């Protein structure tokens, strides 16, 4: 039994909070905190009476370290689950350090004025967290998150050495809009409009956005076009997987999405450079986010499935081997359970699991760690229990 402070009240946070309330044996009490307290109150009202978990709410500016410290000291949680924006990772980390509270997030830090995410800012906290005697668990979503757990599990149970990892993220869902993003539009568009990259033979290979395209036949979804992107777990897996030669990340996109994205880029709407408009400074991408559908509203209208997983190639007992670990998630089943589409569900469930494992001591050690640095077995068991069952194949089609 423990207490968790959950910062954020968007689509992913809503799922994680639902799952914490389903898991009241672990989460005795939670506090939902966001800049907009009314959203937290509405979620509390929806969940109270359905759970034994006690729910509090609070208003907090996640950019303000002093406010965060005051809230942590008032609520006194065992863990802080950061489901706010990636720009706010470091202020929340600083508050956890000041209060000696364990920290979990789902995405790595990204400066608001630079569309570039990497782990160096968070890894810089290693000694500070170690000295404070607290744990920071980085990237406890699906990708990053479950993909790292899958990698650790494959290395522990299936391989002596993993040489190649292809991470495949397929969303076969249809929300009916000409253009919408399945998670925070600002973060999503920054990610897909950046240069791609992959890790090969000890160094980064950079590509133009959407330059490398492949087709893959996904179980439960069918044949889809997918594109190579830069993704954060590549950076940590390159360090933590001994013998690794190449890691790539592919994500599926439909032609309508890509056409709209290119058009928006061409007219400057994906820019993060501030402009003056009627005497006020605005960021075009943030304005675009305001006019696009809220990802949290897509649940009731999204149909289809996701398929996210990792294809591994390596050696076992001196012989070449391949292995595929993946999860299939149904958008409408997610909506029936927690009122969300599957993109938020596949991130929110692992966020709850990571917080649970840190809180109950299973994954506790002082310092800053990526998810693949812990024993994967408890997490893999919890995925099956809490709504993200995984599948295996020992003869998958490979990506060229």
List where the protein language model places each region:
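Conserved N-terminal Rossmann-fold NAD(P)-binding element of oxidoreductases
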Residues: 4-11
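Short beta-strand element of Class I
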Residues: 29-31
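Helix N-cap at the beta1-alpha1 junction of Rossmann-like dinucleotide-binding domains, i.e.
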Residues: 36-39
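Rossmann-fold cofactor-recognition segment
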Residues: 49-64
